[in-house]
Amino acid sequence: MNRMKIHNTLKLVSAIGISELAGIIGSVFTMPSVTSWYAEIAKPVINPPAWVFGPVWTTLFALMGVAAFLVWRKGLKRRDVKIALSIFIGQLIFNTLWSIIFFGLHSPGGALVEIVFLWFAIAATIIAFAKVSKPAAWILAPYILWVSFAAYLNYSIWILN
């Protein structure tokens, strides 16, 4: 394998790893509440079973990492790449904060406010990524769709409780 392939492979693994790390940090706050607080609160009829969320989020974090890699490999010397990846890191932080607020603090209302910021951060990431790599932007489509659904669930849980 030549140097460039090794370098790109390391970037891909790093980008996915950083993205998954955000999910792991969020899960530290999520897991203790899934079988206690979250199991007891009222949820909307279309709320998926708890076991669905782990595989969905693991997949979405991997897709985020692939998208970030497609942007990163264009080169950090480019201003648009730096901006796009900075926005990306910001949305990862918002993503992690949602788990802390919703599951850690048991605050559906606070999490509802936060998920609005997350949604706009994802939209900003998609726009910034599209300027660098259209495929990277499209790879994030399932993510913003899922967060839109999660926002509906969050709102419903807030109303029901």
Residue ranges of model-derived segments:
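Hydrophobic alpha-helical segments of small multi-pass membrane proteins
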Residues: 85-94, 111-125, 143-147
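Juxtamembrane boundary at the C-terminal end of a transmembrane helix
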Residues: 151-161
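Helix-adjacent hinge/juxtasegments
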Residues: 62-99
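Membrane-interface helix termini and inter-helical loops of multi-pass transporters
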Residues: 32-46, 160
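Membrane-interface helix-boundary motifs at transmembrane edges
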Residues: 3-7, 72-82, 130-137
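N-terminal signal-anchor transmembrane alpha helix
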Residues: 2-29
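Membrane-helix boundary connector in multi-pass membrane proteins
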Residues: 102-108, 124-137
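Membrane-interface loop-to-helix entry segments
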Residues: 48-63, 106-118
